[in-house]
């Protein structure tokens, strides 16, 4: 049972969409969370991902780290890819791996590449929070990318506040509301005491002011 008023949420989303301006980029809509009654040092730090009904970021870039079959499929669909030789060419250079991590929102990797990734690249992608998702042998590349584009990840680190991208200003009011409701519902399921651990919730666009919804 959500404690966020449907009317308050809709009003907040409507305000974000009404105040959006023409920009050179599509603004992301973020859910900002402040927790309470939680000790990151003592309590278990939660992490989890959920697939939302609609795409979160408008220009979500995915790169395939693949075997020959996956790279061929990526090339056909005009999706960026790197094979093992291209990855080895980075020579575990921390700056180059960091640059690669910054260039894309997410990575997909074939099983054979995933198993040797740490050895080839070092821990760079993992440190950037972009460890690749497994791309199975017979999985449809476009479907897999769509799943990533709709996915949001919650991870508690050392501080009791976090922000996650839950949509963008190109979505409709209904689409944004659906994404935000699903995100909040999943977040509550991760928390030790559910709603008792939530201090407040805000939504905001990249360039807009935060709007309190709880």
Curated annotation (Swiss-Prot):
GO terms for cellular component: cytosolic large ribosomal subunit. It is found in: Cytoplasm. The keyword Lipoprotein does not apply. CDD domains: Ribosomal_L1. One of its GO terms (molecular function) is structural constituent of ribosome. One of its GO terms (biological process) is translation. Pfam families: Ribosomal_L1. Keywords: Cytoplasm, Ribonucleoprotein, Ribosomal protein. InterPro entries: eL8/uL1-like, Ribosomal_uL1, Ribosomal_uL1-like, Ribosomal_uL1/biogenesis, Ribosomal_uL1_3-a/b-sand. The keyword Metal-binding does not apply. Its main location: cytoplasm. It comes from the Eukaryota. Gene3D superfamilies: 3.30.190.20, 3.40.50.790. Belongs to the universal ribosomal protein uL1 family. Component of the large ribosomal subunit. Component of the large ribosomal subunit. The ribosome is a large ribonucleoprotein complex responsible for the synthesis of proteins in the cell. This is Large ribosomal subunit protein uL1.
């Amino acid at each position: 049972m959500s404690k966020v008023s449907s009317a308050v949420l809709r009003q907040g989303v409507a305000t974000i969409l009404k105040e959006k301006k023409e920009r050179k980029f599509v603004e992301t809509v973020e859910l900002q969370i402040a927790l309470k009654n939680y000790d990151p040092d003592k309590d278990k730090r939660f992490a989890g991902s959920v697939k939302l009904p609609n795409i979160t970021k408008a220009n979500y870039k995915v790169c395939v780290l693949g075997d020959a079959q996956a790279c061929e499929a990526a090339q056909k669909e005009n999706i960026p890819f790197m094979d093992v030789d291209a990855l080895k060419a980075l020579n575990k250079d921390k700056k180059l791996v960091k640059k690669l991590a910054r260039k894309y929102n997410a990575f997909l990797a074939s099983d054979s590449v995933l198993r040797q990734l740490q050895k080839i690249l070092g821990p760079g992608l993992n440190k950037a929070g972009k460890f690749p998702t497994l791309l199975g042998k017979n999985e449809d590349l476009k479907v897999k990318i769509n799943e990533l584009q709709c996915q949001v990840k919650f991870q508690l680190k050392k501080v009791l506040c976090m922000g996650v991208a839950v949509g963008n200003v190109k979505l409709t009011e209904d689409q944004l509301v659906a994404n935000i409701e699903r995100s909040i519902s999943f977040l509550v399921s991760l928390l030790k005491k559910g709603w008792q651990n939530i201090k407040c919730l805000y939504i905001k666009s990249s360039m807009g002011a935060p709007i309190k919804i709880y």
